[in-house]
Amino acid sequence: MASQLIIYSAHVVLLVLVWLLAYTEVVPVLSYIPECAHCLVYYIYAAFNVIYGVATFNDCAEAKVELLQEIKQARAELKQKRIID
């Protein structure tokens, strides 16, 4: 199973490669759309990438339970040392 860094890096490398090919006009994609839309296409891709990342974010129930237990333990220690009420 690939780590998230490798998956993210693959997406970034692919995006940069496609952008460079279009920017250097090796692939004349950018000549078909107005110049003001070049950034818009990039922004749409960036927004989609963020939305996709949020939608596929894994919820770890075990980590949540462990974190809540550590918070309770820390509060108990702080109360014992009379730092908090």
Swiss-Prot record:
It is found in: Endoplasmic reticulum membrane. Pathway: Protein modification; protein glycosylation. The chain crosses the membrane at residues 13-33, 37-57. One of its GO terms (cellular component) is endoplasmic reticulum membrane. The keyword Membrane applies. It is a multi-pass membrane protein. InterPro entries: DPM3 (IPR013174). One of its GO terms (biological process) is GPI anchor biosynthetic process. Keywords: Endoplasmic reticulum, Membrane, Transmembrane, Transmembrane helix. Stabilizer subunit of the dolichol-phosphate-mannose synthase complex. Belongs to the DPM3 family. This is Probable dolichol-phosphate mannosyltransferase subunit 3. The gene is dpm-3.
